[in-house]
Amino acid sequence: MNTTTYVRPGEGRHYPMIDGDHIAKAAVHDTGGAFEVFEVIAPAKPMAPPHVSPWAGVLFLLEGQITALVDGTSYDVEPGGLVVVPAGTPATFAVVGESARLLAITSGDGAGRFFADFAGSVPVDQPAEDSMAAILAVTGRHGVALAGG
């Protein structure tokens, strides 16, 4: 069944993660396939290790500046810039400056489940190195892998 979805500014389910707050805005499932839409509000932090996910993603920068690292190539992205990350491609990003706000669109319906599991399993108030066992458990459950790992 096709239905219209309207989400007001500030609405959505929040998934606090080590690289920022991932806010689920919409999940669409119809005869043409599935995709999910997230707003990501990311603070300046060290770049997380590149990771590989089973879904493709589009990162559209709304505010701030990021450096996206996709398959070994670095992209300096400014507001209005867009990076497409194919499924199975190592990728990560770092905020340049104080913070950034992105619109992320992912193929399929797995990213939301991954974000929910990660947010519920990995503490955001400690360094990623200290949570590596939890991170690896969550990534393993969702077909996500650290690049080179």
Predicted regions and their residues:
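Ligand-binding loop in jelly-roll beta-barrel domains
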Residues: 31, 67, 87-112
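Short, conserved beta-strand element in jelly-roll/cupin
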Residues: 37-43, 52-70, 105
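A contiguous, mid-protein "functional segment" used to position or interact
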Residues: 98-134
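A short, N-terminal "cap"/entry segment at the start of jelly-roll beta-barrel domains
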Residues: 1-34, 125-149
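Short beta-strand segments in beta-sandwich/barrel cores
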Residues: 22, 46-48, 64-69, 83
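Short acidic-glycine-tyrosine-enriched beta hairpin
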Residues: 8-9, 65, 72-90
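Conserved short histidine dyad/triad with adjacent acidic residue
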Residues: 9, 22-25, 38-53
